[in-house]
Amino acid sequence: MDENIIINILRKEMMPGLGVTEPASIALSSAKAYEVIGGEIKNIKIIADPGLFKNAFSCAIPGTKEVGNEMAALLGAICGDASLGLECLRKIKKEDVSKAKTMLDKIDIEIKSQTEGLYVESIVTTNNGIGRTIIRYKHDNIVLVEKNNKILYQKENTLNKSNNFSQEAIDSKKITEMKLDEIVEFVNNVNYEKIEFLLESIKMNKKLSEKGLEGLGIGLGKLILESCNENNYELYAEALTCSAIDARVSGATVPAMTVTGSGNHGIITTLPLLAIKEKKNLNNEVLARSIALSYIINIYIKEFSGKLSAFCGCAVAAGTGVSAGICYLLGGSLKEIENTIKNMASNITGMICTGGNLACSLKANTGVKAAFLSAKMALNNIVIPNKCGIVSNSIEDTMKNIGRIAYPGMMETDKEILNIMIESSK
């Protein structure tokens, strides 16, 4: 495959995001809908797919102590800046939060069950009329903008049901046409200057981690770091990862570099690699190459599991990606990278997702632990053999199988998780 296609996919899948991407997507949608209509807000209606609704259900809004779909939508309309994309709530103020709290009776949330892929629609009614937006397939992909039933903007071929979802999704799908040996060949041989941009994710996510080490969230990252000695890069990796996620899900106003639409995925696919790099005094080039491998494997799996799913994509998809990156950084061969992925597939695949919340760092820690264990096993010639569980004869089919566990495998599980969350909130 043309290396420029791979590089473009990596660039496309990377994006700064403030807070968890699902409430950010809701806020962006309502911000844009209000932007086109203006005036005094009378009502806001949000229609979201179950996965997006679940992920935003109990997640903190950046810069506030508030959580959930309703507050995300209200704040988007009240103070959101749609031009900032997933950082649309960057300018939030205390008075905006106070105003939103007085307007909770003006918002309605509807779950759109019969839809494929990510979906969020905002209908903002004011004294000036109605503003409406639809976001599809990607968290910031606005495909429709209307003002008083007049279409102001519409992306072609994105409102119809399609197995390929959108042109952007087709691009990333090309990753799944590659064999693992082709992926590793790209990682080894691509000109370093062409992938140096991947290090931007390290700078951004490290700042978030430093914020989390102040004890935000459940304080898991801080707790782990306290028991970490100077040369233990595994515990250091867990601490960096968990503290960044602790900060993110608790509403810290520091952006993460998202990948495949998720800040947590972006954190897990990068920070464990930074930990190894720092403790072993490796250079930036080998770090960038390991990130490229980590990202590509994560993207590969996510193309089959979907952007949002019943399993914890952070621990499973991103965790598998970073396991390959860990093996690579520790000098692993192509065969050892393959065996690392087999070991991951056999371990935590199926861990459930209960949305973006304070428990995310706990699941992330499990994913990072499993990633290091899988790599160490492979580097010591220990591997789960083919035809054992979901491990297939080819590593490509094995990665596909990981995704299949989520979609279609766990669709009913996802519904029940959402039912439990809604019942528990009453």
Curated annotation (Swiss-Prot):
It holds the Pfam family SDH_alpha. GO terms for biological process: L-cysteine catabolic process to pyruvate. GO terms for molecular function: L-cysteine desulfhydrase activity. Belongs to the UPF0597 family. This is UPF0597 protein CLD_2825.
